[in-house]
Amino acid sequence: MPYGNKSKDTILRYSRQIIRFLRTREVKAIVIACNTASAYALDTVAAESDIPIIGVINAGARTAVQATRNGKIGVIGTEGTIGSGIYTRVMKQLKPDIQVTGKPCPLFVPLVEEGLLHDSVTDEIASLYLSVLKGKYIDTLVLGCTHY
């Protein structure tokens, strides 16, 4: 179930439920592989836990900052991930003069789930979303959603 359009409270509730379940399996660590759940729930659930819980945003942000040659990075993701501003915050902590352009792409998730990868509608939607990034001269793009 995509979390991108869920409220912060809902995402936190789901994350806590999943972690409780995983704890019954005696896991040694947990990776929150959803960008939106990492953005909205990671800090809280990690603070509540006695086992390591990590997300995907820090690693993705760090890699993008290391990869960019011109300091201009684009991030696409769900409305939740982009709206949280987490990638911009983390990247600017790593390199304060970095320029980050975020673009929510809410229709990418259902298009991927329906397998509409080579469809004219998909091409139109992708062109519309990504047009915001054109002219920004980004040289690095973060795909900030596990769906794409």
Segments predicted by a language model, with ranges:
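Non-catalytic structural scaffold of enzyme domains
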Residues: M1-Y148
